[in-house]
Structure formats: C-alpha cells, structure tokens
Swiss-Prot record:
Molecular function terms, GO-annotated: protein tyrosine phosphatase activity; protein tyrosine/serine/threonine phosphatase activity
Any Pfam family: DSPc
Keyword DNA repair in record: no
Cellular localization per UniProt: Cytoplasm; Nucleus
Organism: Schizosaccharomyces pombe (strain 972 / ATCC 24843) (Fission yeast)
Keywords from the named record: Cytoplasm, Hydrolase, Nucleus, Protein phosphatase, Stress response
EC number: 3.1.3.48
Record's protein name: Tyrosine-protein phosphatase yvh1
Major subcellular location class: cytoplasm
Length: 330
C-alpha cells in the first residue's frame, strides 16, 4: 500500500469556484456556463475506476454517462449541494446534499453512502460516485468506504484513490473528518471521544462564524472517574466537576518559554452542570460550582488564549487554582 507521501492535495483553488458554480445553477439551468466557471484539467472529466466496479467522476461526466448508458453504470451516488437532475431510476440513485465547504459535516453521511455502495457492489453492479469536479466530496465518500471495507487509515485510502485518479483534493475540513472516522474505528457514536470532541469544536466554529451560541449542545453527564483517571473536584466543597474523559487537550504554543507554558486552565467539554449557565445564550460568562456557588471558571464560545499561549476554541475553562485534580485509585 502506498504511503502518506504518495499523494498531496491539488487544485485547492477549485473549491471556491465549485461553490460559486453550484450557486449559479440554483438560479439558472445553464449547465455549460456553470461548468465553465470551474477551471480544472480535462483529465478530471475522466471516469476513474477506483476498485472493481467502483468509479469516481465529475458531474459533467456522470451526466453524459447516465444519458448514454455508456460503461454500464448501474447505480449513481451524487454528492452535490444542488439536485444533479440525472436521468437515473430513483431506486438506483442516492443524492446527498453536501457542500464542498469548510463547515460541511460530511461524517454524518458516511454510513448511508457506505451502505449504498456496498449494496450495489454486492449485486455485482457498477456504482459511480460523483460531485461537481470529482476531486473532493466524491473522493471523501469513496475514501470512507474503502477505509471501513479494508481497515485502512486515511492516507492509505487516499493514496489508493490517487493512484487511479490523479489530482484528488479533499478539502481540509473533509480530511479532518476522515481522520476522526479512522480514530473512531469507522463508527460514529457520541461515547467515542474523538467524535465527541470533533462535534464540540464545531460549536466554536459556529459561534465564530455566526456570532451567537449554537442552539443544540450535547451535554455529558457528570460521572466519577475510573481507576487511573483524574477527577476534578471543587477545592471548596469537593463536588466532582469532571473526569479526565471530558478534558479537551491542547499543547503549549511555546515549549521553550517555561514562564508561559504552564497552563492555568482545564478545558472541558459541555457537562450537565454547565447547562443552566450555557443556555442563557451568552457568548461568554462565568462558571460557579453547582454545589457551593463559588467561582471556578469561565467560558468563551469564540475561544480564548490559555496562559500557555495556545488558542482554544470553544473554551469552557476551569481554573486549576479552584479545583483539586485527584487520581482515582483502583
């Protein structure tokens, strides 16, 4: 299997023009003009067989193939923000409304797309996965399928695809989500820390982009630490605030400057006792101990700089000076 260095993202400038082209199509049926808006090599219009009976192409190629029944494509998966309007029987077509953007949650579609691809291949049918240019959304969905099917990591899947379709370029947001998918062993469950913390960081992205608090926040129940874990307890009343399962890790920005690398905060995921304060809808505020009401920390949905100089977003912070970190014995 090819190593990580076998592929590198290309054509990053295409992503913004793809969004513009799909936006244009929402108000016009001028398909050719929309295609002309995106300048990419003609080679990306090729039909690429990634593994037996599994193909990737651009939208232009997909439209031509399904209209002529060329190559014998039986099932088509469309990953576009607009309806691709393909002449495909409904039961043989899956349209996932996905944008090629830095905020799009594509993880939520992996299970559905994996099942669609697996079903088609189980019937010895040919399945085509396409987006607008055939370099980002379609590649990400096929990579997720290959990762789960072959127990591959992200780089192995993308190297495999790149060997068969040169010039792939999943956007940075999609790459992060593929890596979370691998870290979660191809499962999406809020009990899994990598997935939970990825969702949490999306809250901060939302707050920065929209200048308001996210409307739906998932709260963890306060649970006692397991053997060997840390338990954070209010220094004044000993109330258990969190276990190390819900710590949000970050690395000091400048490890060579010791005076600034000592973190004075514990950053946490949302925990049930925070809910009354966070549901006030403020972008920032303070945390009081739910038992003794003494101040223990603060929060800033749009992020704050830790004393170690690292930026943390969102920031739900407990001051280390206000709690005791106790390691639970077995």
């Amino acid at each position: 299997m090819s190593n990580k260095s076998a592929w590198q993202p290309q054509f990053d400038e295409i992503h913004s023009s793809v969004q513009e082209a799909e936006g244009f199509l929402q108000s016009s049926n001028d398909v050719q003009k929309a295609i002309d808006e995106v300048h990419y090599p003609d080679s990306l219009n090729d039909l690429s067989e990634i593994s037996k009976n599994l193909y990737i192409s651009s939208w232009k190629t997909a439209s031509e193939l399904v209209s002529t029944s060329d190559k014998g494509i039986d099932y088509t998966l469309s990953a576009m923000s607009i309806n691709p309007n393909l002449s495909v029987p409904e039961q043989q077509h899956l349209w996932l409304q996905i944008e090629d953007s830095s905020s799009q949650n594509i993880l939520q579609y992996f299970e559905k797309s994996n099942k669609f691809i697996a079903f088609a291949l189980s019937k010895n049918a040919k399945v085509l996965v396409h987006c607008f240019a055939g370099i980002s959304r379609s590649v990400t969905l096929v990579a997720a399928y290959l990762m789960k099917e072959n127990n591959w990591n992200t780089e192995e899947a993308l190297s495999h695809i790149n060997e068969r379709r040169s010039g792939i370029s999943p956007n940075a947001n999609f790459l992060r989500q593929l890596r979370v998918y691998f870290e979660c062993n191809y499962q999406l469950d809020r009990s899994l820390r990598p997935y939970r913390q990825w969702l949490f960081r999306r809250y901060g992205d939302f707050a920065v982009l929209n200048t308001r608090v996210p409307s739906e926040v998932a709260y963890a129940e306060t649970v006692r630490a397991r053997a060997g874990q840390l338990e954070l307890r209010c220094k004044k009343c000993r109330f258990v605030l969190a276990s190390s399962d819900y710590l949000v890790s970050h690395e000091p920005k400048d490890e060579n400057n010791y005076s600034h690398t000592r973190c004075t905060h514990y950053f946490l995921e949302p925990i049930r006792w925070m809910q009354p304060e966070l549901e006030l809808g403020n972008l920032e505020g303070r945390f009081d101990c739910p038992k003794c009401n003494s101040k223990i920390g603060s929060y800033k949905w749009q992020g704050l700089q830790c004393s170690c100089l690292q930026w943390v977003c969102p920031a739900l912070s407990i001051l280390q000076s206000r709690v005791d970190a106790v390691r639970k014995l077995g």
